[in-house]
């Protein structure tokens, strides 16, 4: 129903390594981000959540935090930076870091769970792990899902015969669908915690 619509004002930060990976072409990076956000919008529309890109910051000179292969440390640093720096400059609900750094092990993204609207913890870090916009967009949708209180799908969760967004492992052919479990968990979190920042559009 429309009255339960929520709005996530999303801010995306691009680290210096990713800037260099795209040969310093900010326009190309921005185009990629817009494609990714459109995919995320589509994915979240069935959840009655609108994803609105409120800003992009590209670290074209140098990284403003220590980005490292240990994803938990990078997430911690990014959260602190968001809380003390970015939030003072730009109004937004959630921030995601895109990095060219190859995180340790099979990790391609990491985020806090059930943390939407928290100054430090409404954040995630995403490895730019594929040439395909879809693959990285689904990874970001997945990490944002954790911020919205959604945990990984178990065997009984389904999204109509596809590989769902909150699957513990990214499929080679991911879908833009959340499972029935994800919908229930997301709205349980929203109804119980009532994160204020996503009630309005900026």
Swiss-Prot record:
SUPFAM superfamilies given in the database record: Metalloproteases ('zincins'), catalytic domain
GO molecular function: calcium ion binding; magnesium ion binding; metalloendopeptidase activity; metallopeptidase activity; toxin activity; zinc ion binding
Coarse class of the protein's main subcellular location: secreted
GO cellular component, one term: plasma membrane
Summary of activators and inhibitors of this protein: Inhibited by EDTA, DTT and high concentrations of zinc ions (>2 mM). Weakly inhibited by TLCK. Not inhibited by PMSF. Activated by calcium ions.
pH-dependence annotation: Optimum pH is 7.5.
CDD domains xrefs: ZnMc_adamalysin_II_like (cd04269)
Residues making up the signal peptide according to the UniProt record: none
Summary of temperature dependence: Optimum temperature is 37 degrees Celsius.
Protein name, per record: Snake venom metalloproteinase atroxlysin-1
Source species of the chain: Bothrops atrox
